[in-house]
Curated annotation (Swiss-Prot):
Gene3D superfamilies linked to this entry: 3.40.50.12370
Subcellular location: Cytoplasm
The protein's name in its UniProt record: Universal stress protein E
InterPro entries cross-referenced by the UniProt entry: UspA (IPR006016)
Gene that this polypeptide is encoded by: uspE
Family classification: Belongs to the universal stress protein A family.
Annotated NCBIfam families: PRK11175.1
UniProt organism field: Yersinia pestis
Length: 318
């Protein structure tokens, strides 16, 4: 039995084609498990009208939920008839990301899949406010699915942070690699690559310190990263040819290598902080995500505290 046995798929209400559902079925066919197709809907006009009694408004909401449930059933019919176990749940909620996270917590889902919309001309993925809320706050891994089939001979690229002094990063690196290898083992033996980017010498240092040698600095930084990468790959028996230590900004290096390797998915860690430090899902991670042209799997560290309460009953669920 593989990892990710209890999958939640966030249904896109605006189109019949559901890439996230397709990807979930692809995983279940190779990895086992079950799927729940989930949709949170809301229409302010149903709550604004004063011409309807509370009972009538409730009945109208339930009618809309019933219609949407039937629509999702039609999208799932082929998969269900093929033997894929899919449950369907539609709820009335004015904040989709909260409804999704509450469902993750309530039903203990271990993976969330959601479609990511693609910019037509740039090929990069466009993330909505709901997407960002989920990436920051959802306690289980979040797989953002591009509207493309898995590439032929596609790889998985794991972005690890080997330069941070943040104590959360070392165990998070281990978790990223471990979970990706476990998943890849069950999904067509997908090759797993590791990538770490290291910074170039700040120009102002060379100007302010005449005796400073940028080449010595760069060699030292690269050496530190190579040693750390070797230690990481050896823990998992990964061949050196599958590891990459590249000079430059992560938001440039990681998407470029993903494209070069024909990556089907980039796996990275999100610390999911809130408040002021939310600027660092962290700043670097958000820039990387914005530049990707493939699927994204974002994983939180162990012990992550979800800021959303999970014990609310979903209103008017079906």
């Amino acid at each position: 039995m593989g990892k990710y046995q209890n999958i939640l798929v966030a249904i896109d209400p605006n189109q019949d084609d559901q890439p996230a559902l397709r990807r979930a079925v692809y995983l279940v066919q190779r990895n086992g498990g079950t799927i729940k197709a989930f949709l949170a809907i809301y229409d302010l006009s149903y709550d604004m009208t004063t011409l309807l009694s509370p009972d009538e408004r409730t009945a109208m909401r339930k009618g809309v939920i019933s219609q949407r449930s039937a629509w999702i059933s039609e999208q799932c019919r082929f998969y269900i008839d093929s033997g894929i176990p899919i449950d369907i749940k539609v709820v009335w909620h004015n904040r989709p990301y909260e409804a999704i996270i509450q469902e993750v917590l309530k039903a203990k889902h271990d993976l969330l899949l959601k479609m990511a919309h693609q910019h037509d001309r740039l090929e990069s993925i466009i993330f909505t406010p709901t997407d960002w809320h989920l990436l920051r706050k959802c306690p289980c891994p979040v797989w953002m699915v591009k509207d493309q089939p898995w590439p032929e001979e596609g790889t998985a690229l794991v972005a690890v942070n080997l330069s941070s002094e943040d104590p959360l990063h070392d165990p998070l690196n281990l978790r990223l690699v471990k979970e990706t290898l476990e998943l890849a083992e069950h999904v067509n033996q997908t090759p797993v690559h590791l990538i770490s980017a290291y910074p170039v010498t700040p120009i102002n240092i060379a100007i302010e310190l005449p005796d400073f040698d940028p080449s010595v600095y760069n060699d030292a930084i690269r050496g530190q990263h190579l040693v750390a990468m070797k230690a990481l790959r050896q823990q998992f028996g990964i061949d050196e040819k599958f590891t990459h230590v590249e000079k430059g900004l992560p938001e440039e290096v990681i998407p470029d290598l993903a494209e070069h390797l024909n990556a089907g998915v980039v796996v990275l860690g999100t610390l999911g902080r809130t408040g002021l430090s939310a600027a660092f899902i962290g700043n670097t991670t958000e820039h990387v995500i914005d530049n990707l042209k493939c699927d994204l799997l974002a994983i939180k560290p162990e012990g992550f505290t979800c800021p959303i309460e999970g014990n609310e009953d979903q209103e008017d669920a079906e």
